[in-house]
Each structure stands twice: as C-alpha cells, then as structure tokens.
Amino acid sequence: MENSQLCKLFIGGLNVQTSESGLRGHFEAFGTLTDCVVVVNPQTKRSRCFGFVTYSNVEEADAAMAASPHAVDGNTVELKRAVSREDSARPGAHAKVKKLFVGGLKGDVAEGDLIEHFSQFGTVEKAEIIADKQSGKKRGFGFVYFQNHDAADKAAVVKFHPIQGHRVEVKKAVPKEDIYSGGGGGGSRSSRGGRGGRGRGGGRDQNGLSKGGGGGYNSYGGYGGGGGGGYNAYGGGGGGSSYGGSDYGNGFGGFGSYSQHQSSYGPMKSGGGGGGGGSSWGGRSNSGPYRGGYGGGGGYGGSSF
C-alpha cells in the first residue's frame, strides 16, 4: 500500500503566527518529516493559515492522523490526507465522506473481494455492487462504505486499484447537490486569514445514494444508473467490453467522459467541489507548488493576504 501521496498531510486552520519550525516541532513527535511547509501569500508573505507535512512512511502519517485533534499554537487544526495538485480539481476531491465509488468492476468481482481489498486502508462496513433491477446483471460499478473518513481518503488517494487482476477506478461518492454547492470542501469566505467556514461536506449524510430513476451517476462516467450510460471498460468511444451494453446507451469513453443524464450525481459546476475556486482552504494565489486544490475563496486565509 506504500504510496508517497499517503505520507503527505494537509493541515488547515493554522494560527497566522505559526511558523514552519513550529509546525515541524509539533508533528515531528509522530515520525520523521521529509518536508514541512506553511503556505504563504507570495505578495504579502503572510501565512494563508494552512500547510503540509510529509512523513517518511505511511505508518508515521497514520500515527499523526490517529492522534487527532491537534492543537498548534493555540489553534485546533484540521488534519487530512493531502490531495495532489493533479487531482485537486476532480469533483468532490476534498469532500469529507466515508463512501467511495468503484468503477470498472468485471463480472467475476464479488462484494467480498471489495471488502478484502479495501480493508487494507481501514475498517470497511460494507460493499455493494450495483445490478440492474430487472435483469440482475451487474452494471460494472459499486460502492464501498468505510467506518471513518480517513480510511476513505487513503483509498481515494490511490486512483486505480488492482482487484481480481483487473484495474478499477476509485472516487469519492459525493452527491450532486453537494458538488454544485461546493459542499465537498467549500467553506465560507474569510478575508482575515482566520478559520472561516470549515466546509464539512454540505452537512448531510454522504451515504444516502439514490440508485433508481432516470440516469446514471454522471459524475463518475458512463457507468449508468437506472437506464442511462452503461459502463464500457476503458475503451475509447464506447468500445471495449461492455457491462450493460446497448441497454444502457452511452458508454464509458475514457476517464472524465461522463454521461450527462439527470441523476443523483452530477458533473462539477465551475468553482465547486472543493478544488480551485471555492475550496475550503486558502486565498486566490495560484502560484507555487501548492496551487490548485487550496486556492480561491476558501475558509483559511482569504484573498486579502
């Protein structure tokens, strides 16, 4: 399970006075840090009230997570797995959920296989593979429910997982209304660099998925959902081996090419979902190696810094 991204943690809600040495001093108690940074506004050089620490191995990062909540310089900070810049604009990338979508499941994959595989990231409460209500035919996708948010975050950091010899795609299961509202990470805007809104994922249970109705889980591609957008395995233009076949129409034509039918899941509206504009963290700066996932109207450190 060793993955360098799993060793990197995001720390939000820092005291504006917290320095990198102060941050390092606190988190070194849990292991060896290979990197530590407090993100600052490039113009004013003032802290944007969030930062990152990177441990030498996953076990040390896990120990820091397990010790939450953390208080640094008088502030109770929020600790979570850092999302890579590449992934930060994905719908729901910063959402706080316990439920993951798993796509690209072949017919020989059972729910027990999902539980066995994903248990390496934390306790799995259950797994389900979605089947057509009429025919009982598996539709090529399912969901995994974890006991806590960090386990889901860890599993989601690894975008593609090998299960039963097949590569499957994993994403956070974020309801469409939370993506549109920015509830997957959007907090209230703060211009003072303080806590602002913490963006707790829309304040609703993320585990209530509507599987029926007309349309697929269209944030997640042509996996279909009650009649629209069947899953076609990793082929271009609907090619490849199909789960759902012509009965479900629009095939999966590559990652990110998702059906646009009405459903309980939806495509990301510009500025929503916790990436870029509308994230929980930071101001408007897009400079430096930490731009992308934490810049733009967030709750930690507003645009005035």
Curated annotation (Swiss-Prot):
Record PTM text: Phosphorylated at Ser-84 by MAPKAPK2 in response to LPS treatment, promoting stabilization of GADD45A mRNA. Arg-291 is dimethylated, probably to asymmetric dimethylarginine.
Modified residues (Omega-N-methylarginine): 139, 284, 291
Any Gene Ontology biological process: mRNA processing
Modified residues (Dimethylated arginine): 291
Keywords in alphabetical order: Acetylation, Isopeptide bond, Methylation, Nucleus, Phosphoprotein, Repeat, Ribonucleoprotein, RNA-binding, Ubl conjugation
Compartments (UniProt record): Nucleus
Keyword Transcription regulation attached: no
Amino acid composition bias (Gly residues), ranges on this chain: 181-200, 269-281, 290-305
Modified residues (Asymmetric dimethylarginine): 291
A Pfam family hit: RRM_1
Covalent cross-link Glycyl lysine isopeptide (Lys-Gly) (interchain with G-Cter in SUMO2), where: 80, 96, 98-99, 106, 154, 159, 172, 176
Modified residues (N6-acetyllysine): 133
UniProt GO molecular function: mRNA 3'-UTR AU-rich region binding; mRNA binding; protein kinase binding; RNA binding
One GO CC term, this protein: nucleus
Entry-annotated residues carrying N-acetylmethionine: 1
Function summary: mRNA-binding component of ribonucleosomes. Specifically binds AU-rich element (ARE)-containing mRNAs. Involved in post-transcriptional regulation of cytokines mRNAs.
This protein's name: Heterogeneous nuclear ribonucleoprotein A0
Lineage of the species this protein comes from: Eukaryota, Metazoa, Chordata, Craniata, Vertebrata
